[in-house]
Design a protein with these regions (language model features):
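Short, conserved micro-motifs composed of acidic
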Residues: 1-154, 158-171, 179-186
Length: 190
């Protein structure tokens, strides 16, 4: 069996890696071991399961400092042969949301793999054999733009359907910031 592409969880207690060892779902799967008293020695590898692994090859995992797991697979429908996927980390050991493919231009119609983020930043690097490169597999850097949302909202009385004025709403963000809005005479937030 082959083993490669190790990545550590943010707390350094879980090591995820790719391997073609028996007991997987496809060619190469993502497996993990847990540290016992700060050591991985003697830990028995466990498969990450079918929510992450496919009948194809699942490789190049990267555990981000926020708990999100990134990896590449050719076992899910995407833009190319090998695409980068993400499963957002959830509370609990090895708990992840439904995987989703990263959009273009991070994924392309070619092989895209081995993404790595800088700690605490929305930037990093990945490898691709896409057209326009300098060789077979090239490194590409990226910086994700900040998310911006535009919204328009109205507040109405549930029973009468009439707009409510003077209602105060607080919109809270994941980063702890918040904005306070008050409705006008038409019930619109301003």
């Amino acid at each position: 069996s082959q083993v490669g592409h190790p990545t550590l969880s943010p707390d350094d207690n879980i090591l995820i890696f790719a391997s073609d060892m028996p007991g997987g779902f496809g060619g190469k799967d993502l497996w993990y071991v847990e540290a016992v008293d700060g050591s991985f020695a003697g830990s028995i590898p466990q498969n990450l399961g079918s929510a992450i692994n496919t009948a194809g090859d699942d490789m190049f995992p990267h555990y981000r400092d926020n708990g999100d797991l990134y990896w590449s697979t050719n076992g899910r429908e995407g833009l190319g042969s090998l695409d980068i996927w993400k499963a957002e980390g959830r509370e609990g050991k090895l708990a992840f949301a439904e995987p989703m493919a990263l959009p273009y231009p991070l994924n392309s119609s070619s092989d895209d793999f081995a993404i790595a983020f800088r700690d605490g930043a929305e930037e990093g690097m990945f490898t691709s054999n896409r057209m326009g490169g300098k060789g077979a597999d090239d490194l590409y850097s990226f910086k994700l733009p900040p998310l911006e949302f535009c919204y328009q909202a109205y507040v109405f009385d549930y029973d009468t359907g009439m707009p409510l004025s003077g209602v105060t709403l607080t919109l809270a963000s994941d980063d702890g910031s918040s904005n306070v809005f008050t409705t006008d005479s038409d019930g619109e937030l301003s």
